[in-house]
Amino acid sequence: LLSGNYKTKFNQIISNKLAVLSILFFSLHVLGLLWTDDLKWGLTIVKKMSDFLFLLPILLTITKKEYIKYYISAFILAMTLTEILSYLVWFEVIDPLHKATVGNPTPTMSHISYNPFLTFGIFLIAHEILFNKHLSKLYKYVYVFFMVTMSINMFITGGRAGQVMYFVMLGILIFQYYGRGRKVRATIISLIIISSIFLGAYNSSSIFQHRMNEAVKNISIYNTDRNKNTSVGQRITYTINSLEIIKNN
């Protein structure tokens, strides 16, 4: 921020579509304050969304391409340490941190945020295993170990959005690995791996089983008024409203 050259940085931000979308996304929340019925809650949401205004655009101006591998390594290390803390809470070796509980051990952030970050960490590790031809056997074994432990960790926490992202990520990785010429094989392998992991997690993790049963129940009775205020009901409502807005505009 204090390094100067602000004109170049500004041009760098506005020329990046992701950064512009990030700023517009935040701006929509600010604009929404004009018609909200609960200004206090609206300001709370705006505060939560402030990362979209500051974090991504600022990171874009200070990151350098030649250091990307170090950024990725630092992120993987951070998620590995967080995962270890999660297991320590789960096994009751340490007292729960932040808002974590033994039943939902997400020590450094809420389960809503934790699982998407964990999914991204798993994706980066799996990508290294599958596509880095220069990866030594030792690193490969270490990466496989943490990919497995992170995947298990995914299903002892309650973040359904991250779990959905996890299964989508697996499909993407498999299709990337087999390429465009072997779509049928990639589809079959994706279905086998994803369904096997899902069934294994469902039968072995009580919290995952409970969250899945809850989601199915909420969807099945969505049309009743008492169900629309659940997390699943709200997501369905937001999706329907968004599609209507897109359709009408």
Task: Briefly describe each language-model feature range.
Residues 34-43, 155-157:
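Membrane-interface helix caps and helix-loop-helix hairpins in membrane proteins
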Residues 39-41, 94-105:
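Membrane-interface helix termini and inter-helical loops of multi-pass transporters
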Residues 177-226, 240-248:
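A membrane-periplasm/extracellular boundary helix in multi-pass inner-membrane enzymes
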Residues 50, 226-239:
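Extracytoplasmic catalytic/substrate-binding loops of multi-pass membrane glycan-assembly enzymes
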Residues 30-31, 67-97, 109-180, 192, ...:
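Alpha-helical transmembrane segments of multi-pass inner-membrane proteins
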Residues 18-25, 39-63, 70, 74, ...:
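Aromatic-anchored transmembrane helix interface
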Residues 112-119, 218-232:
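Luminal/periplasmic active-site loops of membrane-embedded glycosylation enzymes
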Residues 1-30, 62-69, 73, 128-141, ...:
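Transmembrane signal-anchor hairpin modules in multi-pass inner-membrane enzymes, especially those
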